[in-house]
UniProtKB/Swiss-Prot annotation:
Gene from which the chain derives: ubiE
Organism: Paraburkholderia phytofirmans (strain DSM 17436 / LMG 22146 / PsJN)
Function: Methyltransferase required for the conversion of demethylmenaquinol (DMKH2) to menaquinol (MKH2) and the conversion of 2-polyprenyl-6-methoxy-1,4-benzoquinol (DDMQH2) to 2-polyprenyl-3-methyl-6-methoxy-1,4-benzoquinol (DMQH2).
Lineage of origin: Bacteria, Pseudomonadati, Pseudomonadota, Betaproteobacteria, Burkholderiales
InterPro entries the UniProt entry points to: SAM-dependent_MTases_sf, UbiE/COQ5_MeTrFase, UbiE/COQ5_MeTrFase_CS
Family assignment from sequence similarity: Belongs to the class I-like SAM-binding methyltransferase superfamily. MenG/UbiE family.
Record-given protein name: Ubiquinone/menaquinone biosynthesis C-methyltransferase UbiE
């Protein structure tokens, strides 16, 4: 069986899927609180920037992959309007349930679907916009997932990938201390789960850097790929177009 990484561990590919599922079953209930604590609320600004770059218009069809608690889906549903179609999806049932309930509480009615990004259950050339926020790094076969995202885009459709990336070098030491000391402490203190937040820090370090992800998106068939560094590269937004 092929090996892959789960944080810094080398594991069988099948085991990774189960381990990642376990992480997100564990963190789902406290996901929004922990995002605010870990990022000092900055995740909201990163998502707002992504929403602005997506430029969803009335009537658009949008696929939100790894949609989690629904921040992007909520905004896109309002922008696409009654004539549009926004799918809130996640591979993790616990995250999808929390997101669906949160959207309903906000009065946002949009379809929710359990979805594996490596096997997207939609036809070719269907969506105007596909987004994945803080989900790509957890996928076992990122190249397969990116190719699938491109497949379901319409010609001239755009893929937006918001993900942790490589921080500016002068901040690396401070960022490492924060990631490997503070994040697990926050996880234990507020969610009684240090291990999942240790995985978060490790998975960020194993994720491709800005230029590598840009190349991967190009190899998946996307054109005009560019990226925006946010918060000194803690996060990057990559945008590519299908032609």
């Amino acid at each position: 069986m092929s090996k892959t990484h789960f944080g810094f561990q080398s594991v069988d590919e099948q085991d990774k899927a189960q381990k990642v599922a376990g992480v997100f079953h564990s963190v789902a209930a406290n996901y929004d609180l922990m995002n605010d604590l870990m990022s000092g609320g900055l995740h909201r600004a990163w998502k707002m920037f992504t929403i602005a770059q997506a430029n969803v218009r009335p009537g658009y069809k949008v696929l939100d992959i790894a949609g989690g608690t629904g921040d992007l889906s909520k905004a896109f549903a309002k922008q696409a309007g009654d004539t549009g179609e926004v799918w809130h999806t996640d591979i993790n049932e616990s995250m999808l349930r929390v997101g669906r309930d949160r959207l309903l509480d906000k009065g946002v009615i949009t379809p929710a679907l359990l979805c594996d990004a490596e096997k997207i259950p939609f036809p070719d050339n269907y969506f105007d916009v596909v987004t994945v926020a803080f989900g790509l790094r957890n996928m076992t076969h990122k190249d397969v997932a990116l190719a699938e995202m491109r497949r379901v885009l319409k010609p001239a459709g755009r893929l937006l990938v918001l993900e942790f990336s490589k921080v500016w070098d002068p901040l690396k030491k401070v960022y490492d201390v924060y990631s490997f000391k503070v994040l697990p402490w926050l996880g234990e203190r507020f969610a009684k789960d240090a291990e999942s937040y240790q995985y978060l820090a490790e998975s960020i370090r194993m994720h491709p850097d800005q230029e590598t992800l840009k190349t991967m998106m190009e190899q998946a068939g996307l054109d005009g790929v560019k990226y925006y560094n946010l918060s000194a590269g803690v996060v990057a937004l990559h945008v590519g177009t299908k032609y």
